[in-house]
């Protein structure tokens, strides 16, 4: 870096924009290659600023040579492939392998060469995260080719590697194919048509006749089978002896007698004679292959001609008649057992089926019984809190009664109005009387409470003494009882607490209404006479609708204007301690003001501590070392 001046750095930055390149290190060097002779270095004529760069676009490392003598920009670059190895042959000469040959870098300054070597060998420390996670890095093509050559690939068509691979697909069973072909042509003669006609007739005869019919032609096979074996040895002479083979036909009747004896014995042994012939008929019709499967019978079919074609079908019953008797009983037994066995399984299936319904009925009954029992108490439980809604619905009624009370007083029906008031505010009066007992003490200490006291004590006085100030009481009652009835509706048990808390504020309001900043009770007494006029004004205000009266009553219940405090306006314009610290102002005046008031003392100390911590933090400056060369680039 000592060889590069500011102008050279500007050229490098223009050639390697910061948006797409992260320059890790730069030095001055020359490029040499060992080509075409691997044992001799050749100067390429390229020299300039050699930069180790992390490409932010491709997320790979590059060695790029920038022209600093001219304006050609990047004149050479080499991507650092996978497992890139960087060697130091000399302190001033470093080498690495490229695809075609080796390359060498000749450095001007040895210190810069050693520094550049460390950066290249530990390049992962300065790499971008995406570069480290890049799995698509390029490998050296030369090494890839060598690895591919060293590996033997056995593909599906690897004939070059295995010369005799196709020979394994050659079949040696060619001799069997012509034999089957020689045996196949004889069947085509026109006898096939007669065979079809005779076969159909034989099937009709078999279906029409009883068990005796299939037994008569049955013995034809035994004599035919030995002759067929003799003919197989001389297949060419099988055609002329056909007329001679018809002669042994009378011999089978000698053998027919025992099968005839067997035939009637079978129906006698089997109680069901009809299914027996049906079974061999179906087997003979469905399975004609057992005869042609052996080659002897297949060859005999053309030689024997029609009589053999008529007899293979009944031959099945001969062979099948002997094993057939056992199958029918098996089928009958299986059928009987099948009919009987599936019959019992349904009942067990039906057996478990009924239990679910009883469970369901039982559960339904239990649920109904339990639900009915549970719903009843729930209904009763829900009916328990139901009473509160009536008082909510009856909220307008007390207002109406309260508005009707003055008329009743004017009509001299005070006893009736008294009853309604006692019914509406029966729970609240006790706490009101207690607060009224407190109010005379306050008034006795202050003096001149004569006018306001009857206004405050009109609620209990009406409960005790009816003939007190007819016009004011209804208004005061409307104001005092409305807030009581409003909270009393939702929760009856809390009525005494709410009513006990509600009445005290009105005296406080009457005593503190003229006051603007005095919280304690003693100052109001001298200003009490003014409450008569304010009380008159309040009576004029309460003659409006019930909602406004309720709002005024709630304000009075909260303490009224007396609950407000005076604040020094000089402190409103002053910012907090943190703002003063941020602006650089001294925090001593507000701290002193905060200490002057008892509630402002603790927050002032906390604010001072926080401000001091912020100031200490500002003074601390973390020094970031960019590995001794990162700030320049």
Swiss-Prot record:
Region of interest (Disordered), residue spans: 145-545, 563-606
GO cellular component: actin cortical patch; cytoplasm; mating projection tip; SLAC complex
Coiled coil: none
Other notes: Present with 8580 molecules/cell in log phase SD medium.
Gene name linked to the record: LAS17
Example GO biological process: regulation of actin filament polymerization
Summary of subunit composition and partner proteins: Interacts with KRE6, LSB3, LSB5 and YSC84.
Biased composition (Polar residues): 363-376, 399-414, 454-465
Composition bias type Pro residues, residue spans: 216-225, 238-256, 342-357
Modification sites for Phosphothreonine: 334
MF terms (GO), sorted A to Z: actin binding; Arp2/3 complex binding; small GTPase binding
Bias (Low complexity): 192-215, 257-269, 307-322, 479-488
Keyword line: Phosphoprotein
Listed name of the protein: Proline-rich protein LAS17
Entry-annotated residues carrying Phosphoserine: 337, 588
Domain WH1, first and last residues per copy: 16-127
Alphabetized InterPro entries for the sequence: PH-like_dom_sf, WASPfam_EVH1, WH1/EVH1_dom, WH2_dom
This protein's record includes keyword Iron-sulfur: no
Keyword Secreted in annotation: no
Signal sequence coordinates: none
Domain WH2: 547-567
